């Protein structure tokens, strides 16, 4: 007996053949043919989130006596398999589809319907006893389901991946700040010599940037935790029973362990995604901070003989195919590339967020994809940068001291005693003649050897006073 390679699925456009071993149905199959665009698939976190929505909706519909318990239980079980990632291979659709995410919502409805039918001993594609629209999509619309899945996926990834990764980086930078606090170095402003500080103080600034980034991102979570579910097509809640929105948000919170709530205004939740733009803005700010930190570290580690050479960075791999022995700041370069990608994602996401024409924003898959890519890249890069660079950074104290000793900006310590103009003249003369500050200061007769040695003490210039 020959096993059929396809089965016939139907929708309102008629029949279509689907691979027999695939759970998706007619609408997902049509999407595969209609949107042969790019290689970017719907993120696995969105697929998981759609499973969460479908499970929560089925549980609430059963509780409200709208869904037969046998059908509902099968939907819940099938949706849980989606949540667990067991059915990821059955979600083949690309990002570039209808802007409401309708095809992906129907992909979820069809997969869960067919898997539930299979669990109940029925025939896949028959839509009996579990219908993808009537049962799996009960009390829902793609217009509230996909935005809800967006918020679930983005919040979960921020909470479980990005914030822990940034904490990991902060801990390492803070440890370096404490380890380097005794090392006095010359500061630089406008890339030119400035007054001294400690290397630990410099690293404390990096640690503070990361800590502030975490706080700013956490401030945006309440917006992501507001869910559109229950607004259905245009925000009115048509075909969803009274109380469904609140109950389904409670179920989603219970399933995910994140304090999701129903959005107070469903018209805003469907037509605008300002909370996504706001949250990604904080992520973008974190990328700006990480770009600065990675840049500073690679410049401070430049050399080893002809650069600043204040830091020694871990040597992880050969750096050149032509120059033997060359080692490059590869982790810094990877981090800065990631940050540039996040900047680009922020521009795309900001524009997409502005396109809520009338009652619905139709850039949802793009917004979700860019947001989630930023979170994954920054999370991964933060861990990689920490483990393969930051923890192994060492100070080159001999180079740091040499640069400090020859800096002309130590003259700043004399200004309160001999005046700004006289101090500036000493610095310029020393630079012109190639002499030391001490020599030129004593030559002016404005300060004695004892006073110079008392006033120009780098260790006293790293704090107020």
Curated annotation (Swiss-Prot):
It comes from the Bacteria. GO terms for molecular function: fumarate hydratase activity. GO terms for cellular component: cytoplasm. Signal peptide: none annotated. SUPFAM superfamilies: L-aspartase-like. Its EC number is 4.2.1.2. The active site is at residues 190, 320. Pathway: Carbohydrate metabolism; tricarboxylic acid cycle; (S)-malate from fumarate: step 1/1. The keyword Lyase applies. The record marks 333 as: Important for catalytic activity. Coiled coil: none annotated. One of its GO terms (biological process) is fumarate metabolic process. InterPro entries: Fum_hydII, Fumarase/histidase_N, Fumarase_C_C, Fumarate_lyase_CS, Fumarate_lyase_fam, Fumarate_lyase_N, L-Aspartase-like. It is found in: Cytoplasm. Substrate binds at residues 100-102, 131-134, 141-143, 189, 321, 326-328. Its main location: cytoplasm. It catalyses: (S)-malate = fumarate + H2O. Homotetramer. There are 2 substrate-binding sites: the catalytic A site, and the non-catalytic B site that may play a role in the transfer of substrate or product between the active site and the solvent. Alternatively, the B site may bind allosteric effectors. Belongs to the class-II fumarase/aspartase family. Fumarase subfamily. Involved in the TCA cycle. Catalyzes the stereospecific interconversion of fumarate to L-malate. This is Fumarate hydratase class II. It comes from Mesorhizobium japonicum (strain LMG 29417 / CECT 9101 / MAFF 303099). The gene is fumC.
């Amino acid at each position: 007996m020959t096993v059929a390679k396809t089965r016939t699925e139907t929708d309102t456009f008629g029949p279509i053949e689907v691979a027999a071993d695939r759970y998706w149905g007619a609408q997902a199959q049509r999407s595969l043919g209609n949107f042969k665009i790019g290689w970017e698939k719907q993120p696995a976190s969105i697929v998981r989130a759609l499973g969460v929505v479908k499970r929560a909706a089925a549980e609430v519909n059963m509780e409200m006596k709208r869904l037969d318990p046998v059908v509902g239980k099968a939907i819940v079980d099938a949706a849980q398999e989606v949540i667990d990632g067991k059915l990821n291979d059955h979600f083949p659709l690309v990002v570039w589809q209808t802007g409401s995410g309708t095809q992906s919502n129907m992909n979820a409805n069809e997969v869960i319907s067919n898997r539930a039918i299979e669990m109940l001993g029925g025939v896949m594609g028959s839509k009996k006893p579990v219908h993808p629209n009537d049962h799996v999509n009960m009390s829902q619309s793609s217009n509230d389901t996909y935005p809800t899945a967006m918020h679930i996926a983005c919040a979960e990834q921020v909470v479980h991946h990005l914030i822990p990764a940034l904490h990991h980086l902060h801990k390492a930078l803070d440890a370096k700040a404490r380890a380097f606090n005794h090392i006095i170095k010359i500061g630089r402003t406008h890339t030119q010599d400035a007054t001294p500080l400690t290397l630990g103080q410099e690293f404390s600034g990096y640690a503070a940037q990361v800590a502030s980034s975490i706080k700013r991102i956490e401030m945006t979570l309440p917006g992501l935790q507001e869910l559109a579910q229950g607004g259905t097509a245009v925000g009115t809640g048509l075909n969803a029973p009274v109380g469904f929105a609140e109950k389904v948000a409670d179920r989603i919170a219970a399933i995910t362990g994140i304090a999701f709530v129903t959005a107070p205004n469903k018209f805003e939740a469907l037509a605008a995604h300002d909370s996504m733009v706001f949250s990604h803005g904080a992520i973008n700010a974190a990328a700006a901070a990480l770009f600065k930190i990675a840049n500073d570290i690679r410049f401070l580690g430049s050399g080893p003989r002809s650069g600043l050479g204040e830091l020694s960075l871990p040597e992880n791999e050969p750096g050149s195919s032509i120059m033997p022995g060359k080692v490059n700041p590869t982790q810094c370069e990877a981090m800065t590339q990631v940050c540039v990608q996040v900047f680009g994602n922020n521009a795309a996401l900001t524009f997409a967020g502005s396109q809520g024409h009338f009652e619905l924003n139709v850039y949802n898959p793009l917004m979700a994809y860019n947001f989630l890519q930023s979170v994954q890249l920054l999370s991964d890069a933060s861990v990689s940068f920490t483990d393969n660079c930051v923890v192994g950074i060492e100070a080159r104290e001999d180079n740091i001291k040499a640069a400090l000793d020859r800096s002309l900006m130590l003259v700043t310590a004399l200004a309160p005693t001999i005046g700004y103009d006289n101090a500036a003249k000493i610095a310029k003369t020393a630079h012109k003649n190639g002499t030391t500050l001490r020599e030129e200061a004593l030559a002016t007769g404005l300060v004695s050897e004892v006073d110079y040695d008392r006033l120009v003490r780098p260790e006293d210039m790293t704090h107020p006073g």
